[in-house]
Amino acid sequence: MSGKHVAVLMGGFSSERPVSLSSGAACADALEAEGYRVSRVDVGRDVAAVLADLRPDIVFNALHGPFGEDGTIQGILEYLEIPYTHSGVLASALAMDKAQAKHVAKAAGIPVADALIMDRREFGNAHPMKPPYVVKPVREGSSFGVVIVKEDQSHPPQVITSSEWRYGDRVMVERYIAGRELTCGVMGDVALGVTEIIPQGHAFYDYDSKYVKGGSAHVIPAQISPNIYQKIQSLAVKAHQAIGCRGVSRSDFRFDDRGEGELIWLEINTQPGMTPTSLVPEMAQHAGLQFGEFLRWMVEDASCLR
């Protein structure tokens, strides 16, 4: 029995609050089963005062989205000098900003798709690049706000300039990469297995594919050639290190095996989902680590100055 006091941060106030509550509850239950003393913290604006009162030995960060994975909560934890899981201030901020993460990845020699950054309000009737392309909010996760513009669309979808848009004005317009959706977790500086994600009844791995039961199938190990499998693992570690990640991360890729075999890195996630059936815990289990053991590793890896 560990006896350490772990505060599990969950919820928060981003659009990914429901996802975070699910991750946090699963982690808290598993950590209690591992012998830790756990405090469940539904994060509000007073989180610094709450943590100062709780005085935990370690914070397990199960937050998703802005505030929880953009360097903000990490900065608060550094100020409070409480060791925490996952990446630190700089890596979290870089990874949350898809445009900046892409610049860093490209500079490290990681293959990325052509893209441009623009204000979504500048979209008119003309396409900013030749379709097909993908429009992504620069600072959102869980595929919130992602729009695929197909070849047969004569002008950009109106939803992008709509007053109902809730995902920020800065967007990335990225060349659409056909092919298979592949992802690889990294634990420390070691690649886990490669998983293929097959959305069920969805055009891509959107919110419902990720979080609705039966929304997607996960195939691990991915049924791809050994050299592509190993290349994905190598690129995932390279991205993890280039961006400065700590603990665990997950890199997403597209692989077009129908043509020239183009393999493209899409993005890195410093706060991947943490339920037992989430992608990275599945990868850890494939490597021989049960969910509780995996979380124990993350807690023991926690530190400040990450």
From Swiss-Prot:
Major location (coarse): cytoplasm
Q: Could you tell me which pathway this protein works in?
A: Cell wall biogenesis; peptidoglycan biosynthesis
Q: Where in or outside the cell?
A: Cytoplasm
Cite the binding residues for ATP: 128-183
Concerning Pfam families, the annotation shows: Dala_Dala_lig_C, Dala_Dala_lig_N
Specify which residues bind Mg(2+) 1 according to the UniProt entry for this protein.
252, 267
According to its UniProt record, this protein's enzyme class is ligase
List required co-factors: Mg(2+); Mn(2+)
Q: Which GO terms describe its molecular function?
A: ATP binding; D-alanine-D-alanine ligase activity; metal ion binding
Key words, A-Z: ATP-binding, Cell shape, Cell wall biogenesis/degradation, Cytoplasm, Ligase, Magnesium, Manganese, Metal-binding, Nucleotide-binding, Peptidoglycan synthesis
Task: Identify the HAMAP family for this entry.
Answer: Dala_Dala_lig
Family (UniProt): Belongs to the D-alanine--D-alanine ligase family.
> Briefly, what is this protein's role?
Cell wall formation.
Q: What is this protein called?
A: D-alanine--D-alanine ligase
